[in-house]
Amino acid sequence: MDQQPPVQPQQRPPPSLTNPRFTLELEFVSSLANPYYLSHLAVTYPNLLGISKSSDDSNTSTEGPDPEAQAFAAYLAYLYSYWKTPEYAQFLTHPGATLRALRLLQEESFRRDIIRPQVIEALAGNGLENVQGGQNVEAGDTGHNEGDQGTQQDKENIALKT
């Protein structure tokens, strides 16, 4: 098995519903708006999120981060880099929840914590209201200039509910 990290895609797919790559990525990022899908990812593919399968894996912590987890984190960053733009966000059914999930998934600690039911319930409790701090994503305000303010606010809301 080759240990080189996968090459990150250089180009974004053109925003066209006839482009298979675009529609595949649209379907994936749209599913991230569902906290229970995030839970499914955490339980079914913990290695992708950097979640250790057991606390007995003391050897894995000395080897460094899992290459699959690093590749998935890079892919999530790549997706967030362009889905937050109005050109692409217009295709999202629930842009606020989708972009909130993509933004939170940029944080390693969040990727590890989403296996906890309390975190998923806190996300589900937030619903689609107050997503993106009240910004109107459909009007073109995607929150990509807000820095870490939204991420910190989401973390605080989740911490209060757990």
Curated annotation (Swiss-Prot):
Principal place of residence: nucleus
Q: Looking at the record, which segments are called Disordered?
A: 131-162
Q: What is this protein called?
A: Mediator of RNA polymerase II transcription subunit 31
> Where's it found, cell-wise?
Nucleus
> What is the organism of origin for this protein?
Aspergillus fumigatus (strain ATCC MYA-4609 / CBS 101355 / FGSC A1100 / Af293)
* Signal peptide segment: none
GO cellular component, alphabetical, reads:
core mediator complex; mediator complex
**Superkingdom assignment:** Eukaryota
